């Protein structure tokens, strides 16, 4: 099950115990938690391509989504599906998750490759958000759904209320898609225009095409970030056009 060495160094074990105490977790097997902090840049540099948190992140993303959707469904009976989807998208967005990861000091426990470390990987939103999802996935495997659900709800409740109070920027890709479908009966088409930089410090440029009009390209340190940036510009432009035409 574990693609990394089975034993934990005393210093690393102490670090993991410190994290789970302040995060309110209790792992039966700390190796799972350790794996959740291993970024692919480290495994790639050490020629062990499976010793990273990507599979745990995949699982944690699904657990997070289910818990968030279930909580919203039960807690906001008067809200329509579209509004619940917007709240969920914002609450589990990379921006929101990275903020939560920062509160948990996840950056202190990450295991990164040398190049990623030198490029400031510990502070990158995508890496922090992915690591948090990996921790959720690891806790689900270790302690079951109910324990993972309890942990996620503890993280999510304040975030969801912040979303409702408009403290978080919405998921512009979701907002744009809904607006475009309603206005033009089609969907936005994103296109990667350019990618540059080494693997550990890439920059991506995306444009979005809507009903024959192209917005962008705009850049981001991840594909998601670049898509969100250009979606925000397109959404705000379309909203302005709608206001002017009224």
Curated annotation (Swiss-Prot):
It is an enzyme of class 3 (hydrolase). Disulfide bonds: none annotated. One of its GO terms (molecular function) is double-stranded RNA binding. SUPFAM superfamilies: dsRNA-binding domain-like, RNase III domain-like. Residues 16-144 form the RNase III domain. Keywords: Cytoplasm, Endonuclease, Hydrolase, Magnesium, Metal-binding, mRNA processing, Nuclease, RNA-binding, rRNA processing, rRNA-binding, tRNA processing. Pfam families: dsrm, Ribonucleas_3_3. It catalyses: Endonucleolytic cleavage to 5'-phosphomonoester. GO terms for biological process: mRNA processing; regulation of gene expression; rRNA processing; tRNA processing. The keyword Nucleotidyltransferase does not apply. Mg(2+) binds at residues 57, 130, 133. Its main location: cytoplasm. GO terms for cellular component: cytoplasm. It is found in: Cytoplasm. Its EC number is 3.1.26.3. Gene3D superfamilies: 3.30.160.20, Ribonuclease III domain. Homodimer. Digests double-stranded RNA. Involved in the processing of primary rRNA transcript to yield the immediate precursors to the large and small rRNAs (23S and 16S). Processes some mRNAs, and tRNAs when they are encoded in the rRNA operon. Processes pre-crRNA and tracrRNA of type II CRISPR loci if present in the organism. Belongs to the ribonuclease III family. This is Ribonuclease 3. It comes from Treponema denticola (strain ATCC 35405 / DSM 14222 / CIP 103919 / JCM 8153 / KCTC 15104). The gene is rnc.
């Amino acid at each position: 099950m574990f693609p990394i060495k089975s034993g934990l160094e005393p210093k690393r074990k102490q670090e993991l115990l410190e994290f789970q105490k302040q995060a309110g977790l209790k792992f039966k097997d700390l190796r799972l938690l350790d794996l959740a902090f291993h970024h692919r840049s480290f495994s790639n540099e050490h020629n062990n391509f499976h010793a990273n948190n990507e599979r745990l992140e995949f699982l944690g993303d699904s657990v997070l989504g289910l818990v968030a959707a279930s909580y919203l469904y039960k807690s906001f009976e008067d809200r329509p599906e579209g509004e619940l989807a917007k709240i969920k998208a914002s609450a589990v967005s990379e921006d929101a998750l990275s903020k939560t990861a920062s509160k948990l000091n996840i950056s202190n426990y990450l295991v990164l490759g040398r190049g990623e470390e030198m490029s400031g990987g510990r502070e990158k939103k995508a890496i922090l958000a992915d690591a948090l999802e990996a921790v959720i996935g690891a806790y689900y495997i270790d302690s079951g759904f109910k324990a993972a659900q309890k942990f996620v709800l503890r993280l999510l409740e304040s975030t969801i209320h912040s979303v409702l109070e408009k403290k978080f920027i919405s998921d512009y890709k979701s907002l744009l898609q809904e607006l475009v479908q309603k206005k033009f009966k089609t969907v936005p088409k994103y296109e990667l225009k350019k990618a540059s930089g080494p693997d550990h410090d890439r920059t991506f440029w995306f444009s979005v095409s809507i009903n024959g009009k192209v917005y962008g390209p705009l850049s981001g340190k991840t594909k998601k970030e670049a898509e969100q940036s250009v979606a925000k510009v397109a959404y705000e432009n379309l909203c302005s056009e709608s206001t002017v035409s009224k």
